Amino acid sequence: MMCALPGTGKDTWIRSNLPDVPMVSLDAIRAELGVSWEDGQGPVVARAFERAREHLRAHRSFVWNATCLTPDLRKRELQLFRDYGAYTEIVVLEVPWEEGLRRNRNRKAVVPEDVIDAMLGRFTPPSVREAHEVLSVV
């Protein structure tokens, strides 16, 4: 599971470090469904959970690629992983503020700076109690 603000390089980190591991990406599902991050996320999350269950049933490793910035936002997904007996690792990515904003401006789906700032205000780093392993990449 990834844990990071928009623009920190989650996709890039996954491509560089886990190139052969399937990914369940909320951004990719939004694009498939034609849903903006500003719209209701119910169908996006439902599709993501369907895909996660497919991987879990097949005992196949995968990456959950979303911001996952608070314990509440991680809880449901991590419970699903535990229900299937999966080994869970949370990768926390952090970059300097200005670098993250620059990267965000170069994304296809730009998130407004005030929204990212609010997300940062709610960010709660994961506890080692939430997963088998927590990796922090700065």
Regions found by a protein language model. Name each.
Residues 2-3, 8-11, 16, 20-22, ...:
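Conserved GTP-binding G-domain of TRAFAC-class P-loop NTPases and closely related GTPase folds
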Residues 8-62, 69-72, 97-102:
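Conserved substrate/cofactor phosphate-moiety recognition/catalytic segment
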Residues 23-26, 85-87, 112:
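Short hydrophobic/aromatic-enriched beta-strand-loop microsegments
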Residues 32, 56, 69-109, 118-127:
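ATP-dependent NMP and nucleoside kinases share a basic, alpha-helical "lid"
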Residues 41-45, 82-83, 109-112:
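Short, low-complexity, polar/charged sequence segments that are solvent-exposed and flexible
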Residues 44, 83-84, 130-135:
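Short, charged low-complexity intrinsically disordered segments located at boundaries
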